[in-house]
Amino acid sequence: MKKILVTGATGQLGSELSVLSSSYNQYEWIFADRTQATLDDLELLESQLKEINPNIVFNCGAYTAVDKAESEKYLAFTVNHLAVGLIAKYVRENNAKLIHISTDYVFDGSSSVALDEEAKTNPINVYGESKLAGEIDCLKENSESIIIRTSWVYSKFGNNFVKTMQRLMQERDEINVVNDQIGSPTYAADLAQAMINIIESPEWISGIYNYSNEGEISWYEFAESIKELGGYNCKVRGIPSSSYPTPAKRPSYSLLNKEKIKTVYNLEVPNYKESLRKMFA
């Protein structure tokens, strides 16, 4: 029986994989939280990998506090860069497989067309820099790795934009949401299923892939969709990102082109509204 290690087990994606795992009991699933797969302690992480001895690693764990990363660069790079390289090296040396999760924040937002896997990377914040460094080391240490870049992840688990909007729309009569950052949300349950479909596929084709739900929207439009599905009475006002300054810059355009993953792994990618409906169901 093949053993799958899921890092970041209590996060959005790890939690969705946990839900799906019961339907795939041909695998032994190991769900490791930050104490069982210590991505911020490389020496300990190495011994944990040896002890678990996985055949497949889903590296869902990451340092994702985008604004905080600006002042915690060392920690962000340890988790998002150095730990990734260590996992990739372990996987190569032990003839295992790795799916590593990355981000749209490796891009600078200057594009006006959906970004494919070959698009020029140029992160504009520490979080994006650390994730790009992780991608580079991942493929350097193990060229057979699969990296999936995703964006705007949400789920019924953990903290995310959808749950924040639900709370604010219940508490307030009016909220402001930025309307000049464009991309597409990712329902973590869809991404989790895509990852399982990849390991179930007869072929393992390494490299970088993009995955998010279909549709091109702003955060404001996403908030309007949440309002509509939730039946909230709160007024949503679109504002420019310049009116909502944050320590870390965000890319203004980071829509991901999903043609490669759809073609190579024959995946159907749902529209964001369809997936948002599933979360509300």
Where are these regions (language model features)?
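C-terminal amphipathic/interface module of NAD(P)-dependent oxidoreductases
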Residues: 217, 234, 252-281
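Glycine-rich Rossmann NAD(P)(H)-binding loop
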Residues: 177-182, 209-216, 264
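NAD(P)-dependent short-chain dehydrogenase/reductase
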Residues: 136-183, 190, 196
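NAD(P)-cofactor binding segment of oxidoreductase domains
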Residues: 71-99
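Catalytic helix-loop patch of NAD(P)-dependent Rossmann-fold dehydrogenases
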Residues: 78, 82-86, 106-148, 153
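Mid/C-terminal beta-alpha module of Rossmann-like enzyme folds, strongest
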Residues: 12, 171, 201-247, 252
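N-terminal Rossmann NAD(P)H-binding glycine-rich loop of SDR-like oxidoreductase domains
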Residues: 3-22
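NAD(P)H-binding glycine-rich loop region in Rossmannoid oxidoreductase-like domains
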Residues: 42-79
